[in-house]
A protein has these predicted regions:
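Conserved N-terminal beta-strand and adjoining loop/helix that marks the start
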Residues: 1-22, 75, 91
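Active-site-adjacent beta-strand/loop module that shapes the phosphate/pyrophosphate-binding cleft
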Residues: 17, 76-98
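NUDIX/MutT-family hydrolases
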Residues: 100-132
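Short, low-complexity, charge-dense intrinsically disordered segments
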Residues: 136-158, 164-170
Length: 170
């Protein structure tokens, strides 16, 4: 019997500091989904809310940081009981604010993407990184000159592969 999923939409921010390290947050241990695991800041899009407004709101609620968004850099999927959540990941910049976590999270770290494997990641983020790695291995000869020096380049290269996977083409 095939499960009929309700689709949920979440947005996530890929925020890097001047060293190229990316902000990750540790979910509280009493969280319903991915308790105690690490993830990118962000959350659910409310009905009628734009991606940008939702992500700016979620990041502020979770971190007290005001951000400016750049581009969509990837997509991931999370299968929960009865809900299939699609996570749209956008790059952004911190504009102002002191990092102060809400009660949804109990820790944070600034970490290089290559070191994410040292953390117990939320399932959707772990899946996204695995797909990014696979896509970059098969597309090594593709070089985007515009982002070649950008620390977010590995994420940006994965957009097509992520979307294809969500659509079931890979």
């Amino acid at each position: 019997m095939m499960i009929e999923y309700v689709f949920g939409l979440a947005v996530r921010a890929l925020l890097s500091n001047s060293e190229g390290k990316i902000l990750i947050l540790k979910r509280s241990t009493d969280s319903k989904t991915n308790p105690g695991k690490w993830e990118l800041p962000g959350g659910k899009v409310d009905q009628g809310e734009s991606f940008d407004k939702a992500l700016i709101r979620e990041v502020y609620e979770e971190t007290n940081l005001k951000i400016e968004l750049d581009n969509v850099v990837g997509v991931s999927q999370q299968n929960l009981p009865l809900i299939r959540a699609v996570h749209i990941i956008m790059s952004g910049k911190i504009e102002e604010g002191e990092l102060n976590l809400s009660n949804e999270h109990e820790g944070y770290a600034w970490e290089f993407l290559d070191n994410f494997s040292d953390y117990e990641l939320a399932d959707w983020l772990e899946d996204f990184i695995k797909n990014r790695t696979a896509a970059s291995q098969t597309d090594e000869d593709i070089e985007d000159k515009k982002t070649s020096e950008n620390p977010l380049n590995p994420w940006i290269k994965n957009i097509g592969a992520s979307v294809d996977r969500i659509r079931g083409k890979r």
